[in-house]
Amino acid sequence: EALGLTLTVFIEVALNKKDKETRDSFMERIRLWPEVLECHFISGEYDNLLRIVLEDIVAYRKFVLDKLLAIPEVEKTRSSISLGQWKSTTALPLGSA
């Protein structure tokens, strides 16, 4: 937040094709975007889950309309705006099983 990046959004992205070429093309593009902190390849109705951090809702709107939806491989998206973070850790649960 000290850098003015106060908005965290999780965006599910469905691609219009499920082949490797489509996935690779999508990944090549989003790897270039500093707003995208994480991208997970997921199961279910959507193919990818992005975690992005932005300044505000105006920057979010611009990101979705000018970048994400401009990718031809993107069929649809669904976003969830984080209202707060309850837990964040990099520690692995070693020995907890």
Segment roles from a protein language model:
Residues 1-97:
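A compositional/biophysical signature of low hydrophobicity enriched in polar/charged and small residues
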